[in-house]
């Protein structure tokens, strides 16, 4: 098993993979879109690695910027019906904190990404809520109502969910929905 890989980004392949050169060996690693967007040719990166061996015996390496992303992936794939592709689609759009917050607050709209359907969302919420609460990750849900209302407001203004969530993450905790929307709009106008 590979725990981490540290090396130089040799090439960005497709929309979700890089070739990471470590000691003269190039590893093809799939990354969440949020992580991949920060990778450029020549960058030195350290990734936490999950290895998946498919039914056909072909191995796939999944890379994460931190342990939180890796642990979130591990939690998601334990849910019946969630495979690596589905979990990566979720992590392409949401940070682990946003995933945990959506689970605890039962925010179905936040989890409806990458073709994830209502039945699977229900299963994710029902199977992971006790686990998320057990690890006290529900501290991320403190601002969920404000965030959910702010996302809805930004969506109604024509922004995409990914952009809205990214802007709200950058502005951090706000006192009110209005304040969150105002700050997010300033962030989006940059």
Curated annotation (Swiss-Prot):
Cited function: The RuvA-RuvB-RuvC complex processes Holliday junction (HJ) DNA during genetic recombination and DNA repair, while the RuvA-RuvB complex plays an important role in the rescue of blocked DNA replication forks via replication fork reversal (RFR). RuvA specifically binds to HJ cruciform DNA, conferring on it an open structure. The RuvB hexamer acts as an ATP-dependent pump, pulling dsDNA into and through the RuvAB complex. HJ branch migration allows RuvC to scan DNA until it finds its consensus sequence, where it cleaves and resolves the cruciform DNA.
InterPro entries: DNA_helicase_Holl-junc_RuvA_I, NA-bd_OB-fold, RuvA, RuvA_2-like, RuvA_C, RuvA_C_sf
Stretch list, region Domain I: 1-65
GO MF, one example: four-way junction DNA binding
Region Domain III, annotated ranges: 142-190
CDD domains linked: UBA_RuvA_C
Similarity comment: Belongs to the RuvA family.
Keyword NADP: no
Assigned keywords, A-Z: Cytoplasm, DNA damage, DNA recombination, DNA repair, DNA-binding
Domain notes: Has three domains with a flexible linker between the domains II and III and assumes an 'L' shape. Domain III is highly mobile and contacts RuvB.
Subcellular localization: Cytoplasm
Biological-process GO terms, alphabetical: DNA recombination; DNA repair
NCBIfam families documented for this protein: PRK14600.1, ruvA
One cellular component term from this protein's GO annotations in UniProt: Holliday junction helicase complex
Assembly and interaction partners: Homotetramer. Forms an RuvA(8)-RuvB(12)-Holliday junction (HJ) complex. HJ DNA is sandwiched between 2 RuvA tetramers; dsDNA enters through RuvA and exits via RuvB. An RuvB hexamer assembles on each DNA strand where it exits the tetramer. Each RuvB hexamer is contacted by two RuvA subunits (via domain III) on 2 adjacent RuvB subunits; this complex drives branch migration. In the full resolvosome a probable DNA-RuvA(4)-RuvB(12)-RuvC(2) complex forms which resolves the HJ.
Region of interest (Flexible linker), ranges: 137-141
Segments of this protein annotated with the region Domain II: 66-137
Record's protein name: Holliday junction branch migration complex subunit RuvA
């Amino acid at each position: 098993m590979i725990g981490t890989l540290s090396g130089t980004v040799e090439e960005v392949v497709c929309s979700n993979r890089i070739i990471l050169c470590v000691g003269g060996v190039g590893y093809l690693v799939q990354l969440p879109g949020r992580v991949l967007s920060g990778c450029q040719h020549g960058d030195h990166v350290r990734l936490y690695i999950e290895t998946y061996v498919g039914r056909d015996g072909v191995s796939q390496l999944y890379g994460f910027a931190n342990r939180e992303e890796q642990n979130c992936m591990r939690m998601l794939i334990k849910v019946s019906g969630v495979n690596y592709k589905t979990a990566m689609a979720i992590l392409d759009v949401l940070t682990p904190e946003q995933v945990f917050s959506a689970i605890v607050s039962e925010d179905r709209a936040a989890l409806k990404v990458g073709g994830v359907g209502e039945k699977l969302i229900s299963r994710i919420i029902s199977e992971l809520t006790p686990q998320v609460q057990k690890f006290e990750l529900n501290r991320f849900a403190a601002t969920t109502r404000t965030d959910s209302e702010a996302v809805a407001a930004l969506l109604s203004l024509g922004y995409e969910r990914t952009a809205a969530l990214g802007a709200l993450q950058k502005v951090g905790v706000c006192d009110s929905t209005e304040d969150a929307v105002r700050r997010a709009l300033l962030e989006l106008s940059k």
